Amino acid sequence: MSSQAGSEEKKKRIILIGRSTAGKTTLCQRINNEELHYYKTQTVQVINKNMIDTPGEYLERRGFRGALIVTSADADIILVVQDATAGGTMFPPLFCSMFAGKPCVGIITKADLADEEQIQRAKKYLKDAGAGTLYVTSAVTGEGVEQLVRDLNIL
């Protein structure tokens, strides 16, 4: 192995968790510089070997939450994704505590469609869920995405 290869830091593997239409798949598309288009994630998708995109039903239906825990075992960082324009949240208090001490990062999506009050409410939802660092993002405008990628070392 060359010294250069040995000195490269391993890219982090992330899992995105959030309700249906929270913007998980669209955020993955933006991170990977793909054309943005909506499609419903039906099954767990592994994108570029380091992003795990989960169906919203895994969060929305309590019976599937065990699948989130099992799927998250392959991730280095948990991303809890909250749509800034949503009137509520699916994340119960201390939701992040079920991921065995893995870093839990809060991602607020659709910032381009939200006002400041909605963004602050989304931040509260994610903090209550146990998220540490928070990022305010828009897959449409790119707001916050470059910083997220750089900070989490996911590309």
Model-found features: residue ranges?
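Conserved Switch II/interswitch segment of TRAFAC-class P-loop GTPases
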Residues: 59, 72-91, 101-118
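Conserved nucleotide-sensing/catalytic segment adjacent to the nucleotide-binding pocket
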Residues: 39, 46-83
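Conserved catalytic network of the ASCE P-loop NTPase/AAA+ motor domain
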Residues: 7-9, 43-45, 70-74, 96-102
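Structural signal for short hydrophobic segments within the conserved structured cores
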Residues: 50, 105, 133-135
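Canonical P-loop GTPase G-domain recognition
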Residues: 114-155
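Conserved G1/Walker A P-loop phosphate-binding module
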Residues: 1-54
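A short acidic, amphipathic alpha-helical/loop segment
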Residues: 66-67, 90-95
